[in-house]
Amino acid sequence: MASLSDPAVREFLTRGTRTGKLGYLAASGRPLVTPVWFIVEADSLVFNTGKDTAKGRALARDPRASLCVDLEEPPFGFVQVQGEAELSEDPAELLRTATAIAARYMGAERAEEFGKRNGVPGELVVRLRPVKVLAVFDMTG
């Protein structure tokens, strides 16, 4: 089984601006998937979401989630992280993570702007702590 400490997994997850597809459960038990911007920090995948969004409410109710990141061109591949979400509303952590995520996806020149917009009260920092990591880097061979 792969892990987030594996350099190949980390390189795959952090390359460019690949979007994660977050899987979680609605209150009815129905599976849902939504795109998220994320960063890798230590042993977790980290993203922000609103406390009162479907994602925020669902993860507060049931922290089980999975996040899949894929390569949509040859040689095709993916990393799937299954785990438990930990939620934080700490203002300093919100601003720091929102700014880091913005730097990855919007560029350093707009990081502060988007960090201030997204790192505000009512938002959550979500840390997906892996229970299982699956990785396939070349699906053509």
Predicted regions and their residues:
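Extreme N-terminal tail/first-helix region
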Residues: M1-G16, P75
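Charged, gly/pro-rich active-site loop segments
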Residues: M1-L4, F78-G141
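Hydrophobic alpha-helical segments typical of transmembrane helices
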Residues: S5-V9, K55, T97
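Alpha-helix boundary recognition
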Residues: L13-R15, A60-R61, G119
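Short beta-strand segments
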Residues: R18-K51, L59, A65-V69, F78-Q80
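A short beta-turn/loop motif at secondary-structure boundaries
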Residues: S28-R30, E73-P75, K116-V120
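Glycine-rich nucleotide phosphate-binding loop and flanking beta-alpha elements
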Residues: V46, T53, K132-L134
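Short, surface-exposed beta-strand-loop junctions and turns on beta-sheet-rich folds
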Residues: T53-K55, P74
